[in-house]
Amino acid sequence: MIISSSELQISYQNLEDMFNIALQKEISEWRKEKDEFFRDPFNNEGRVTGKYMPSAVFQIWLKIPKNLVSDENLNKLLFDCSESGWNVKSKWQDDERTGEEQIYFLVTKQ
């Protein structure tokens, strides 16, 4: 059996889910630190919207080998985030401790 590299890639939905889970964790930590009340930053579908967030900056690292994420899915994630009120920049880099490849996201509210 021959498996093409596209069959081994992470789906857009899985990439979006991983990103949203990581961002939700960052927002929860931020809320604890700031001890500020604001409206729920997630819409009814569980996607992060940022609509009611005060200004904040979040850093997210996802340990995913680069060959498992297509440029198309990454670009779609960045576009969808911008449509939801977030400014997201991404960069591939190696973890300094483990040498594992990871994607780094810098997330700010627009």
Annotate each predicted stretch with a short phrase.
Residues 1-71:
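N-terminal leader/targeting segments
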Residues 2, 73-75, 94, 100:
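Short, well-ordered helical secondary-structure segments
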Residues 31, 74-84:
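A short, charged, amphipathic alpha-helix used as a generic interaction element across diverse proteins
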Residues 80, 85-110:
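C-terminal edge-of-domain segments
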